[in-house]
Amino acid sequence: MLSSVMAPLWACILVAAGILATDTHHPQDSALYHLSKQLLQKYHKEVRPVYNWTKATTVYLDLFVHAILDVDAENQILKTSVWYQEVWNDEFLSWNSSMFDEIREISLPLSAIWAPDIIINEFVDIERYPDLPYVYVNSSGTIENYKPIQVVSACSLETYAFPFDVQNCSLTFKSILHTVEDVDLAFLRSPEDIQHDKKAFLNDSEWELLSVSSTYSILQSSAGGFAQIQFNVVMRRHPLVYVVSLLIPSIFLMLVDLGSFYLPPNCRARIVFKTSVLVGYTVFRVNMSNQVPRSVGSTPLIGHFFTICMAFLVLSLAKSIVLVKFLHDEQRGGQEQPFLCLRGDTDADRPRVEPRAQRAVVTESSLYGEHLAQPGTLKEVWSQLQSISNYLQTQDQTDQQEAEWLVLLSRFDRLLFQSYLFMLGIYTITLCSLWALWGGV
């Protein structure tokens, strides 16, 4: 009775065990596991992966500029973010895909295989990039290695044409140890495709990517020839923010100074106005000095622009001071007590009666008050009247000379203004020509 009950139970247990055994998979049963084990079991990453040691391993390079992070003109350093790709053939990592469940591509750890020792010659800082520990290997032994790199490289930055400057920085890739007989370099894409490819570039920074030209060359040294590929990153600065914050305010201040020439030469407000413009320009120049890049090699053209504009403002103020000085000296030479250098501002421009004339008027009043009591008073009154008449004639001559002198100074002021305007125009044309020549505008 018991045996009849246990028999079906044992049958169920055996069926369940068979099903579990069928559904359980072990890594040893995976074709991918067998393939990776077979490829790496006897692999030596210290040996260049060729069967014929006289055959060079060709490494194909490609580069995508992702972003321009920083341009340090003072330290001559460029920081860029690039996508870098290496492709080479490893003869020790090929297989027949039909023997491994039609697997045509596999990912392997980069640390377990041979990799070319490619470096960037212009590197000046430790590269920082995400750790991508795997590479793709296909059945023919072709390996693809992708590297997003943040490159901090040395670059000869020319800021003379700032803010319309165009920079050309190079990134040179070469093997640090292997000569061209062992490791050769080549382009993964044609240089024409690399030059005009901007699809990966983030064009929302201060710089615009113009092109990425590339050249192949062999560097000869005492140890032999080394293959190298140089990528020239050509970029142009977006000048709008600097034009608005630096150039336009400076141009406005220069135009305001030109407008001050329409004030009369003998107007006191003219010198005060020009002095205020000069002080305002000096404060503006000090506040904006941090926006101009500093370079040891050369001073940016905009620095010369600020200096010459300030020199023009000083020249304009000095010219007005000289004109007022001429007018002041002329008035001092015309009479004993000088007039003020500016007309119409005080009571000094009204005719003043000398003490002698004042006494004459008083005497005349007193004489008439006494009804001409003394017989000699008529002669004295006549003498005083003649003195007043002579003074008025002298005053008229002085006013006429002053008017003629003002006309002469106005003509001289107009001549100086035209000369000032001519020099300013020549300077503006020269500055724009230099910016266009150096900046490639």
From Swiss-Prot:
SUPFAM superfamilies named in the record: Neurotransmitter-gated ion-channel transmembrane pore, Nicotinic receptor ligand binding domain-like
Presence of keyword Signal: yes
Locations listed in the record: Postsynaptic cell membrane; Cell membrane
Membrane topology: Multi-pass membrane protein
Identification of the protein by name: 5-hydroxytryptamine receptor 3B
Cytoplasmic compartment residues: 260-268, 325-414
Highest rank taxon of the organism: Eukaryota
UniProt xrefs under InterPro entries: 5HT3_rcpt, 5HT3_rcpt_B, LGIC_TM_5-HT3, Neur_chan_lig-bd, Neur_chan_lig-bd_sf, Neur_channel, Neuro-gated_channel_TM_sf, Neuro_actylchol_rec
Function field: Forms serotonin (5-hydroxytryptamine/5-HT3)-activated cation-selective channel complexes, which when activated cause fast, depolarizing responses in neurons.
PANTHER family registered for this protein in UniProt: NEUROTRANSMITTER GATED ION CHANNEL
Keywords: Cell membrane, Disulfide bond, Glycoprotein, Ion channel, Ion transport, Ligand-gated ion channel, Membrane, Postsynaptic cell membrane, Receptor, Signal, Synapse, Transmembrane, Transmembrane helix, Transport
Signal peptide (residue range): 1-21
Stretches that traverse the bilayer: 239-259, 269-286, 304-324, 415-435
Record's comment describing the protein's domains: The HA-stretch region of HTR3B seems to confer increased conductance to HTR3A/HTR3B heteromers compared to that of HTR3A homomers.
PTM annotation: N-glycosylation required for membrane localization.
Disulfide bridge partners, by residue number: 155-169
Reaction(s) this enzyme catalyzes, per UniProt: Na(+)(in) = Na(+)(out); K(+)(in) = K(+)(out); Ca(2+)(in) = Ca(2+)(out)
Residue ranges, Extracellular side: 22-238, 287-303, 436-441
Residues with attached carbohydrate: 52, 96, 138, 168, 203, 287
Family affiliation: Belongs to the ligand-gated ion channel (TC 1.A.9) family. 5-hydroxytryptamine receptor (TC 1.A.9.2) subfamily. HTR3B sub-subfamily.
Tissues where the protein occurs: Expressed in the brain cortex, in the caudate nucleus, the hippocampus, the thalamus and the amygdala. Detected in the kidney and testis as well as in monocytes of the spleen, small and large intestine, uterus, prostate, ovary and placenta.
Any one GO BP annotation for this protein: chemical synaptic transmission
Spans annotated as HA-stretch: 381-413
Gene label: HTR3B
